[in-house]
């Protein structure tokens, strides 16, 4: 750490993947969460910017285990977080486990729901998630074998969160009219619409609403139900 500081390094990222020792052991990580805590303490002592990376869906991981990892990471108070859903890439240890039938990748829907829950927790803790999902690198795509990959993974997660916000507002109404209008910031319209208007279609089906209109506004920070 001293060497990094002396050479003007300002940001350090740790790919901790998980805080669960069983998960870390299953993927051959040599250090456990205690070691991670020690490293974070050393980084903080030298006033370096700290980023932590998580990988949901590793062997022996599940929803409760990963959300505990999220809670543990929040306790470490990093400056930012990246979340990389686990994918099976050719010529890796995980690929060998997959080939032997020892690892089953998560579905896209399952991963989206888990990452959504994690994003909500990080937002509550005021910790920015600066990246979700891998870049669409040609080399990676050539070697991608299986797993919950989507080129717009972050958009899908943010769109699910947006849908939940609309649903929550509608649920608070005493009487739900056949038509509703939401005011949304112009830069978030696509999030509230959902992919191919999936959010609007889903909400209409849930509540038996005939029409949902989105009214663009540039002077609002968040969603507002107006009718």
Show which residues each predicted segment covers.
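Conserved non-cysteine loop/helix-boundary elements of the Radical SAM core domain that shape
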Residues: 1-86, 90-109
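Auxiliary Fe-S-binding modules of radical SAM enzymes
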Residues: 101-227
């Amino acid at each position: 750490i001293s060497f990094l500081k002396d050479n003007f390094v300002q940001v350090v990222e740790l790919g901790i993947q998980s805080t669960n020792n069983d998960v870390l052991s299953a993927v051959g990580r040599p250090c456990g969460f205690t070691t991670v805590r020690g490293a974070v303490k050393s980084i903080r002592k030298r006033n370096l910017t700290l980023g932590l990376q998580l990988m949901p869906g590793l062997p022996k991981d599940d929803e409760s285990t990963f959300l505990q990892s999220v809670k543990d990471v929040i306790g470490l108070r990093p400056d930012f977080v990246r979340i990389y859903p686990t994918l099976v890439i050719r010529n890796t240890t995980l690929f060998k486990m997959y080939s032997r039938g020892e690892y089953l990748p998560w579905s896209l829907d399952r991963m989206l729901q888990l990452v959504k829950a994690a994003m909500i927790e990080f937002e509550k803790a005021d910790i920015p998630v600066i990246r979700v999902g891998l870049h669409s690198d040609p080399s990676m795509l050539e070697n991608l074998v299986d797993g919950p990959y989507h080129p717009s993974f972050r958009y899908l997660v943010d769109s699910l969160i947006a849908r939940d916000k609309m649903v929550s507002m509608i649920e608070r109404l005493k009487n739900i009219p056949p038509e509703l209008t939401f005011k949304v910031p112009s830069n978030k319209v696509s999030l509230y619409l959902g992919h191919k208007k999936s959010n609007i279609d889903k909400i209409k089906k849930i509540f038996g609403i005939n029409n949902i209109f989105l009214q663009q506004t540039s002077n609002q920070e968040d969603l507002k139900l107006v009718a």
